[in-house]
C-alpha cells in the first residue's frame, strides 16, 4: 500500500512538472512572438507549433491569445517582483521603507537592462493585470508578491491607512514616469530622475502613514542602497 502510494505521489509530481514545462514553453514562445511579430500577426497555431505542444494543451491554460498575453504580463511581472524580493532578503534590509525603495530600484535596473520586457509590460499593463501578477504563485508555488508586501509591512510594525492603495500609487508613479526616462532619456535620464522619484515615493508613504513618521530617502552613501547606474 505504502509503496503504491509513494509511486502515485511520484507520478503526480512528474505530471505536474510536465504540465509546468508545457505552460512555460507556451509562455516563452508567446513572449518571443509577441515581442518580434506583434500580437496582431501572431496566431495560436504559431505559438503551439513553435512551442512544440498540441493546440488542445494551449486551451487547457488559455482562452485565446489575448488571455495568454494578459497572463504573460502577470507572469513576467510576477517573476520580476519575485527576483526583487529575493534580492531585498539577500541584502538583509529590515526597515519597510528601505525595502520598498530597494525593490523599486531593483526593478528599474532590470527594466533598464531589458528594454524588450519594459516595452511589453508597459504596453499591456493595467492595475487588474498587476494585481494578477501580485497574486500569481511564483517558482516555488508558495510565494506571491502582494502577500510578501503585506508581510513586510506587518513585520515593520508601521501602519498605513490603505496599503493596497499606497502600493497602487507607487507603482503607477514608477510605471508612468520612468518609461520615457529609460527608453528616450526624456525629460531626463533615469540616473538623473532617480533621486526625485525616491523622494516622491517617500512623500507618498508619508501621506498614507498613520504613524506620522518620515520615511528616510535612500542616499548614495547609504550602505543598503543599490548603486545602479542607468
Where are the language model's segments positioned?
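Hydrophobic alpha-helical connector segments
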Residues: 71, 85-113, 167-170
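Helix-turn-helix
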Residues: 25, 33-67, 71
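Short secondary-structure transition hinges
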Residues: 109-147, 183
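Alpha-helical DNA-contacting segments of helix-turn-helix folds
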Residues: 62, 69-79, 83, 121, ...
